[in-house]
């Protein structure tokens, strides 16, 4: 009987121990689950906060990007050309290459030191100068804008009415250096400073060659009739108190052509009237292109246009 009571007592103790262990395990699991859930919640909250913070930064970054100054040069097309006295006025149609601002507007283009060059369909540079758009920022209507640029007679190398606008190419380059000061332009046009003198000389020399070829047919009619000669110059020639270079020679041609719409350029070595006196003659000659019936009529033309005997002579090309 004592042995039976001992077994019952032992079983009771074991049961109590097992119950305590079960309670401890349940309590431990509850604590572990609570801690894990809290950790996951905090992690999710942290991740959500991080994502929200990332969106804010992205939005701020975009706004900051949109509000940056427009430094990319716009694309350009040549709309039309005209003249102001002897200067060339080019109307350009610009298309912005910059993003819109956060207000939905296209950022203004107001870079300084922007070289604008116009080329013909053969790739010849026929106008080039450096403009400061900070003085007259380009304001876009949507993504486009129209601007007027004025080129002096030392900045363009093609008579304004011989420029083919439909086939011309316009190139804008930022970060370029000009020489001298920009002059004043008429109306709303913006004036620019000169490009490098060596580049200008090269463009002027090419322009003289182009002009000679272009004017050949117009010159041919003066084999049989008279016209008036207004200038004869060569590169390196000393006259009128200065040394003449290609830019000077072409500038004089442009100025004379504004005064006399029929003015043409010829090469003295191509025509008998000059080679008879000097077989090695090599001058760029400006003719008024106006027809006169006689030497006397030509002299009268010179006088009526304000030229003295040293500046105007009656010639034919035979």
Task: Give, region by region, the residue ranges found by the protein language model.
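Acidic/polar low-complexity segments and flexible, solvent-exposed patches
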Residues: 1, 5, 10-318
């Amino acid at each position: 009987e004592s042995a039976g009571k001992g077994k019952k007592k032992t079983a009771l103790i074991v049961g109590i121990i097992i119950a305590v262990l079960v309670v401890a395990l349940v309590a431990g699991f509850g604590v572990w689950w609570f801690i894990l859930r809290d950790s996951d919640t905090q992690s999710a909250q942290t991740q959500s906060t991080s994502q929200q913070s990332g969106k804010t930064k992205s939005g701020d970054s975009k706004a900051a990007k949109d509000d940056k100054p427009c430094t990319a040069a716009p694309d350009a097309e040549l709309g039309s050309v005209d003249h102001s006295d002897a200067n060339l006025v080019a109307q350009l149609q610009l298309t912005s290459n910059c993003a819109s601002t956060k207000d939905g507007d296209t950022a203004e283009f107001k870079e300084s030191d922007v070289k604008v060059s116009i080329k013909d369909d053969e790739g010849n540079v026929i106008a080039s100068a450096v403009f400061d758009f900070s003085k007259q920022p380009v304001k876009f209507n949507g993504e486009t804008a129209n601007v007027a640029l004025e080129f002096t007679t030392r900045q363009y190398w093609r008579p304004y009415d011989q420029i083919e606008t439909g086939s011309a190419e316009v190139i804008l380059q930022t970060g370029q250096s000009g020489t001298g000061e920009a002059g004043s332009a008429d109306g709303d046009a913006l004036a620019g400073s000169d490009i490098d003198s060596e580049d200008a000389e090269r463009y002027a020399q090419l322009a003289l060659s182009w002009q000679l070829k272009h004017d050949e047919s117009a010159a041919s009619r003066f084999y049989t009739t008279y016209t008036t000669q207004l200038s004869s110059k060569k590169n390196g020639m000393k006259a009128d108190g200065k040394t003449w270079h290609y830019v000077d020679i072409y500038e004089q041609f442009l100025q004379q052509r504004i005064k006399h719409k029929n003015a043409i350029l010829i090469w003295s070595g191509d025509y008998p009237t000059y080679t008879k006196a000097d077989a090695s003659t090599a001058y760029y000659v400006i003719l008024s292109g106006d027809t006169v019936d006689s030497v006397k009529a030509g002299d009268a033309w010179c006088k009526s246009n304000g030229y003295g005997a040293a500046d105007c002579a009656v010639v034919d090309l035979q």
